[in-house]
From Swiss-Prot:
GO terms of molecular function: ATP binding; heat shock protein binding; unfolded protein binding; zinc ion binding
Annotated keywords: Chaperone, Cytoplasm, DNA replication, Metal-binding, Repeat, Stress response, Zinc, Zinc-finger
Binding-site residues for Zn(2+) 2, renumbered to this chain: 166, 169, 188, 191
Protein name (Swiss-Prot/TrEMBL): Chaperone protein DnaJ
Lineage: Bacteria, Pseudomonadati, Thermodesulfobacteriota, Desulfovibrionia, Desulfovibrionales
Location of this chain's protein in the cell: Cytoplasm
Signal peptide feature range: none
Quaternary structure and partners: Homodimer.
CXXCXGXG motif repeats (start-end): 149-156, 166-173, 188-195, 202-209
Gene name of the record: dnaJ
Record organism: Oleidesulfovibrio alaskensis (strain ATCC BAA-1058 / DSM 17464 / G20)
Gene3D superfamilies linked to this entry: DnaJ domain (1.10.287.110), Heat shock protein DnaJ, cysteine-rich domain (2.10.230.10), Urease metallochaperone UreE, N-terminal domain (2.60.260.20)
Any matching Pfam family: DnaJ_CXXCXGXG
Amino acid sequence: MSQRDYYEVLGVSRDAADDEIKRAYRKKAMEFHPDRNPDNPEAEAKFKEAAEAYDVLRDAEKRARYDRFGHAGVNGNGYGGGGGFSSTEDIFAHFGDIFGDLFGFAGMGGARGPRPQAGSDLRYNLNISFRQAARGDEVTLRIPKNVTCPDCSGSGAAPGTQPETCPQCGGSGQVVRQQGFFQMAMPCSACRGEGRIVRNPCPRCRGAGQVQDIRELSVRIPAGVDTGNRLRLRGEGEPGVHGGPPGDLYVVIRVDDDKTFRRQGQDLVVRKEISFVQAILGDKVEVPTLDDPVTVDIPRGTQSGEVFRIAGKGLPHLGSSQTGALLVEVTVRIPSSVNDEQEKLLREFERLEENRPLRKVKNMFKKAGKAMGMD
């Protein structure tokens, strides 16, 4: 075949990403596949040409040589006008993963048997206390999960025996069905696509190759986690099948509410009730933190609902050395009733409220505070 530019063959730009090149090749392979174009030498030539182009452009090293030197840079790989594949069967064998996924045709690299399958992911819902979330903790989880059967090592066959190759599909897990011009590969009904048959099942797992077990895992809870955060433990999910990798375990966090603190992002909110005398005259009050209590200055004239911010007394930011703040939300307590002496002082304050020196008003509230037992 003529040596056209490989990018032109696949219809992609020279800066095309790998997945774009793969998609373009799939499209060309579908268009010029021999089963779709029987007795068509031109389509077969284009099919081989697309395969040749894809074999170079999918490989980073080959692609770099081609970009620099053109066809001369990759002719040592067997290309050079005649194509790198002597037959369509060679192409099927070389790119069996693509054709198996895309077309389902038989004759793509021989009997490969069942493919490895990754194990399923697991989810574990973990409730932790507010303090555990704030400070971090190490907890032990008991996870019910399937594990590879220790008696048969996952084969499903009784100890001392081995699974047999399926006689119907020859171990490929597929059988061929002719549909018009197409040969479609279907899962073998005799072995259910496994490519093998267990004549003598393992007594322990009953041929499943897996048994259920309780696995204890030690998990570190980072400080600052919140409800909905997920911790991913790689490889701690269900075991893979046919040599596939295990799945992952996702620990989903739920943080219990706290009686003292309310969370606002990485800040903590705490309510502090003060008397109306403290609000007017100002005072020093003690408020709780996650550590020891701290003293907060309440300035004169503080209104109910005002918030005072104490930096560094909140929750740590995940993955950072920064820490949130403690937000002290003040609530001014108003007495529901007063005695005669208190009412007298309040009436006197009402008369003196305007156009009186502040010192006299301050003394008035000191008297009111003593009368109400707030000294």
